[in-house]
Amino acid sequence: MEQARDHLHLRWTTEQHMPEVEVQVKYRTAALSNQECQLYLRHSQQQQVLVVDFQAKLRQVFITETPRCGKKPYWNNEEAESKQNPGSIYCLLLLIRGGMSDSLIKREISNFEIVSKNKKN
């Protein structure tokens, strides 16, 4: 009962202090001691978390695509660019610059990780 009251209070205060257009309350579920707890975040806070995760993922993908042989990476190679065959990092950055949605960015990063793992095997 107390949890439900807290939830209603949080929702009411968020809606009171912010214009309806800006209110994009999303929740994520965290498992704590075998109990599910919903954490409600403002859009700006959630975006901040996404950026941190995204930067870590991008760094990880970048490392897996950097060759260790001393040659220029193919995604930063003029010859590759002239053949219009840039690497996945370059493509991903273009998609982000083009206004790709957060969910699509996450999906694309997952696809790159799968491809990178398959290349190693």
From Swiss-Prot:
InterPro entries: SNURF. It comes from the Eukaryota. GO terms for cellular component: nuclear speck. Belongs to the SNURF family. This is Putative SNURF-like protein. The lineage of its organism: Eukaryota, Metazoa, Chordata, Craniata, Vertebrata. The gene is SNURFL.
